Amino acid sequence: MTTFHVLGFPRVGAKRELKFAQERYWRKELAEQDLLDLAKALREKNWKHQADANADFMAVGDFTFYDHILDLQVATGAIPARFGFDSKNLTLDQYFQLARGNKDQFAIEMTKWFDTNYHYLVPEFHKDTQFKANPTHYVNQIREAKVAGHQVKPVIVGPLTFLWLGKEKGESFNRFELLAQLVPVYVEILNALVAEGTEWIQIDEPALAVDLPKEWVNAYKDVYATLSEKVNAKLLLATYFGSVTEHATLLKELPVDGLHLDLVRAPEQLVAFEDYNKVLSAGVIDGRNIWRANLNTVLDVLEPLKEKLGERLWIAPSCSLLHTPFDLNVETQLQENNPALYSWLAFTLQKVQELSVLKTALEKGRNAVNVELDASQVAADARANSKEIHRPEVAERLANLPKNADQRKSPFGERIKLQNAWLNLPLLPTTSIGSFPQTTEIRRARAAFKKGDLSLEEYENSMKKEIELVVREQEKLDLDVLVHGEPERNDMVEYFGELLDGFAFTKFGWVQSYGSRCVKPPVIYGDVVRPEPMTVRWSKYAQSLTKKVMKGMLTGPVTILQWSFVRNDIPRSTVCKQIGVALSDEVLDLEKAGIKVIQIDEPAIREGLPLKRADWDTYLQWAGEAFRLSSMGVADDTQIHTHMCYSEFNDILPAIAALDADVITIETSRSDMELLTAFGDFKYPNDIGPGVYDIHSPRVPTAEEIEHLLRKALNVVPKERLWVNPDCGLKTRGWSETIAQLEVMMSVTKKLRAELA
């Protein structure tokens, strides 16, 4: 027998049922019991899908109303004391307030789950944090699954990863010090699961794939010795998102009953564990991407393992299937429009079926599933040989780029003189980050056009009307460098993906980003080409309305890559450079059209960093090259801007400087300009625009607040190189607050200009 299991399942439902129910509940349009009933039905469906595919264990406890790390904070009594809630008697409303904030307390901070596009709620640890076991979340789900007749495997994030993912708050201390009192609470929680008749428990320790300090790594031995001794169940330690080869000796000696390895992200690590003498769960189906596996190739890896391990071989996805859309079968439009691409994809339900086929092949031989294996091989061969994917002219263009194609003609010191000469901007020039409010009217017009209820001419006229409004409002405010407001863009990545060859879009390919927020990433399936200009006519039209400088707006290659499902048949670095080269055609067309200030947004550069620091340089090198390629060939007097909206720059500042953008705008208002200090210490050489107010809030900042931030900025950045702008795009704001916020920004800027003149 070969055991097949999954590490976790999507929570939101095939049609985002949980999202819509949550949002109705928050609007007080749905009763609590109705939300609980819907969640129960979703869990039952998830288990049935696994059971129908002959999974041997159902993943239990992975379902959450918001986030699995928030559930663990509740289960360990580690919810922030500042809310004043009792974790043992927490109501559903209070649970959501932890995630979303309330009138007295801001929400728990959210950040990326390792290097995925999912976000978790960051535990807040204080020196005096007291943990208390509250296993209700897991126990209830075990009982539900058992009533439905399922064999269960509860899933819980392990104590070291849980602590690692948190942050110290209040008095200075190291959260590692809390481990000794956290472990007994885990023992209590796990024993509550054992009391429900649980045989196996999956404990996730993805922190093993990052650069852990030595004391953390060493702690695994004692922690798992305690859990093994005091919990009467078999423990499966799950690692994923990267290689754990460096910990192979430690992991093989841990007193656990099984180990899960991610053999998609790090297939090379298998060699280090082939002599493992307990259960080895092989993560062979990609839990993070949407490509169908070549099952014959996977069996070539599994069959020798099966021979060696026998029943100790388990098979699974590489990680939780939370990161993949639910069901490919509902993508009838994609099947009709691009049947070849459709045949190369596998969503959650298809991945579970792939594992089912592998299980049968390992138990009964390949002949027992030859129809399925043949279909898998046909799809793999068709994809490898498709002319739609592989366009020789793209590879040729990349191979024949001139030497130093990604370098500007002259250094910044020379370029800026040429730019200043024609721009003729005042001291502390002002601009916005790009988007302006997306009103209901804009969204309605876009939806009507997509449905065919609005002609192209009618749609374009409504967008032009909106662009004119945005231009006139900026002129009234007396901003220096204007933008067209991006009314025609639904999303900063999807908009470009729809206009570039090599991209496709699903209709129901949603994945959870956090809570009720889901995203539908584009699919990059082939070589990337820009068939025609994408933004030129809009920017050109906007420029025709004003004598002021108009800024062109593009999303950068790294961000497009990071926020998409990316093809896995060529390196990500190659895909990124293809996007950069395609964007360079757009940049040169904008320049030809008279748009000589062009912003290339890269909010995702940091989140693309590999988990291990040893791999950072390679990534930053190709990411930087792709960004610079996107503006290759521009004249020295064309000014390239970039925008980044994240909070940690210190450790990658040399790479940010190496992008060589003439102007960088960054999100700094919420950190009280602290981020800017790093730029000052580093002596960042080019122009910089730190955000002077937080656009994520409708609140209008006071003149004193903006002046305080600008004066702090002037202490770090020479006045000749300082720009003034909001933190981020204004798409989500209303018009009245947008105008009021920008008015304050402009009045403070003018006051300081007069003072500095």
From Swiss-Prot:
Its EC number is 2.1.1.14. Binds 1 zinc ion per subunit. Pathway: Amino-acid biosynthesis; L-methionine biosynthesis via de novo pathway; L-methionine from L-homocysteine (MetE route): step 1/1. L-methionine binds at I433, G434, S435, E486, D601. Zn(2+) binds at H643, C645, E667, C728. It catalyses: 5-methyltetrahydropteroyltri-L-glutamate + L-homocysteine = tetrahydropteroyltri-L-glutamate + L-methionine. InterPro entries: Cbl-indep_Met_Synth_N, Cobalamin-indep_Met_synthase, Met_Synth_C/arc, UROD/MetE-like_sf. Gene3D superfamilies: 3.20.20.210. GO terms for molecular function: 5-methyltetrahydropteroyltriglutamate-homocysteine S-methyltransferase activity; zinc ion binding. Disulfide bonds: none annotated. The active site is at H696. It comes from the Bacteria. Signal peptide: none annotated. 5-methyltetrahydropteroyltri-L-glutamate binds at R16, E17, L18, K19, K112, R517, C518, W563, E607. Keywords: Amino-acid biosynthesis, Metal-binding, Methionine biosynthesis, Methyltransferase, Repeat, Transferase, Zinc. Coiled coil: none annotated. Its cofactor is Zn(2+). L-homocysteine binds at I433, G434, S435, E486, D601. One of its GO terms (biological process) is methionine biosynthetic process. Belongs to the vitamin-B12 independent methionine synthase family. Catalyzes the transfer of a methyl group from 5-methyltetrahydrofolate to homocysteine resulting in methionine formation. HAMAP family: Meth_synth (MF_00172). This is 5-methyltetrahydropteroyltriglutamate--homocysteine methyltransferase. It comes from Histophilus somni (strain 2336) (Haemophilus somnus). The lineage of its organism: Bacteria, Pseudomonadati, Pseudomonadota, Gammaproteobacteria, Pasteurellales.
